[in-house]
UniProtKB/Swiss-Prot annotation:
LRR repeats lie at residues 158-179, 185-206, 207-228, 233-254, 256-277, 279-300. SMART domains: FBOX (SM00256). SUPFAM superfamilies: F-box domain, L domain-like. Keywords: Leucine-rich repeat, Repeat. Residues 52-98 form the F-box domain. This is F-box/LRR-repeat protein At1g55660. The keyword Repeat applies. InterPro entries: F-box-like_dom_sf, F-box_AtFBL13-like, F-box_dom, FBL13/AtMIF1-like, LRR_dom_sf, LRR_FXL15/At3g58940/PEG3-like. Pfam families: F-box, LRR_At5g56370. The lineage of its organism: Eukaryota, Viridiplantae, Streptophyta, Embryophyta, Tracheophyta. The keyword Repeat applies. Disulfide bonds: none annotated. It comes from the Eukaryota.
Amino acid sequence: MFLCVIIPCLCSYLCSLFSWLLGQIPSFLFDKINESWLTSTKRNVEIVKNLMDKISQLPDELLVKVLSFLSTKDAVSTSILSMRWKSLWMWLPKLEYNFRHYSVSEGQGLARFITSSLRVHKAPAIESLSLKFRYGAIGSIKPKDIYLWVSLAVHVSNVRELSLKLFNFAELPTKLPKSLCKCKSIVILKLKDEILVDVPRKVCLPSLKTLFLGRVTYSDANSLHRLLSNCPVLEDLVMERDKIDNLGKLSVIVKSLQRLTLKMSRPCHLDGLKMNSPSLKYLKVIDERLESDSDDESDSDSPRYFYDFEDMPKLEEADFVLTFQNIKKFFGSITSVKRLSLCLGVYTEEVICFHHSIHLIVEQ
């Protein structure tokens, strides 16, 4: 019990100390030590040296725990402090590379560093790998780099959580290795923006529990169905669609699913939604594809606004933002929901009874 209390406190203290120590070291020291700076700040260097000598006496396990509280960039920069620290960061269970507004040369340097860091990573498994690249020079980090990093994370490091966000990254959506669809270790998968979801015929994701698909592109209309059909323990699914992404009718048939969030806005296309998830407890649908009541495609009986919900006996909470009129068909199978939030973008006189609701919010 004593260790359970003292270790988090010690980690918090050392993390604050590291932040201060790293603040004494200029950013260019990550690439090359500047001798003139060392001369002009000899006192600070001595302070850092004395503190590091004391900290370095701690066991590796505790030091790695401390480093895990720092950003990956700061954790890596500690490798220059002494030989004792040179490879400690390679045992980090979580790696996060978040870059924006990078030049061609910076992007190329980042690509080399990330490749080498994944190749020499020593932890038995990567608990979390996050790669986020935004507003960089297109072509500086290539799609083949992303392909390689995901392959290394899957084959070498048994990654458990993978998060990819690629914005303003390449002219075409980035393709991921098919091995990702057969990764037995992955529990959380988040894909966002310029990524191609190309699902092979053989898929096996036995551990995947959380899936986030944000504004991605699908290789064909059945890609999502093949993916979801092979996630036997999936519990949380989030989808955001705001473009032509090659999906037609959306089928969410996952017996284990407990939470579903679906957000759609123009110009994404949908030929209807079919859902059969008897374990569902929370459902959120934001459908903003209509701009006005005068829209040429505002016919609520059109297949593109047809929602086929199977019975959801365990549904406890639902949150809807809708812009089409025929809502009675929409709510036919969820009248047993206990907590409902409803925001309508159109006027309707239809009456719907929710016999089991104990909390109801309606906005228009």
